[in-house]
Curated annotation (Swiss-Prot):
Lineage: Archaea, Methanobacteriati, Methanobacteriota, Methanomada group, Methanococci
Pfam families the UniProt entry points to: Oxidored_q6
Residues at which [4Fe-4S] cluster binds: C21, C24, C88, C117
TM ranges: none
Bridged cysteine pairs (disulfide): none
Keywords of the record: 4Fe-4S, Iron, Iron-sulfur, Metal-binding
Record-linked InterPro entries: Complex_I_20kDa-like, NADH_UbQ_OxRdtase-like_20kDa, NADH_UQ_OxRdtase_20Kd_su
Entry note: cofactor: Binds 1 [4Fe-4S] cluster.
Gene Ontology terms, MF aspect: 4 iron, 4 sulfur cluster binding; metal ion binding; NADH dehydrogenase (ubiquinone) activity; quinone binding
Residues of the signal peptide: none
Names of required cofactors: [4Fe-4S] cluster
Organism for this UniProt entry: Methanocaldococcus jannaschii (strain ATCC 43067 / DSM 2661 / JAL-1 / JCM 10045 / NBRC 100440)
Family designation: Belongs to the complex I 20 kDa subunit family.
Protein name: Uncharacterized protein MJ0516
């Protein structure tokens, strides 16, 4: 009961790196630092897609990661909000001529896109906050149905 009360007012994010240079991942880590402190906005990072409201996907989707990304997406509860972070996640970026499928939207549906190489931490936070209401509304609906 207490866990659900706290979850109701927060947004839980799972970061998935599907290849690339890790530049976007470094910017996501910067979001956790005191300068940005995403937890002040009620945003928490998890490594379990089953706990996530939002998937933040970085890097181009490599051939090795395509099926794994689909599996992770399927494990994520509804509404399965996906945010593609950075140029590589949008189009394959500088890796598009390599062994990649392309951007994230070639493999799973994408709800929001953050351009940049890498994007600024503030852009990442703003985008998560823009998609948060949809995730929170869906979670509340699930909880209400569970109680009935």
């Amino acid at each position: 009961m207490m866990k659900e009360l706290f979850r109701k007012r927060s947004i839980h994010v799972c970061v998935v790196n599907t290849g690339g240079c890790n530049g976007c991942d470094i910017e996501i880590v910067a979001c956790l630092a005191p300068r940005y402190d995403i937890e002040q906005y009620g945003i928490y990072v998890h490594n379990n897609p089953r706990e996530a409201d939002v998937l933040l996907v970085t890097g181009p989707v490599t051939l090795q990661w395509a099926e794994r990304l689909k599996e992770i997406y399927e494990k994520t509860p509804e509404p399965k909000i996906v945010v593609a972070v950075g140029a590589c996640a949008l189009s394959g970026g500088i890796f598009k001529e390599g062994h990649v499928v392309g951007g994230v939207d070639k493999v799973i549906p994408v709800d929001a896109k953050i351009p940049g190489c890498p994007p600024r931490p503030s852009e990442i936070i703003e985008t998560i906050l823009k998609v948060a209401p949809k995730a929170i509304a869906m979670r509340e609906k699930r909880l209400k149905n569970k109680d009935e």
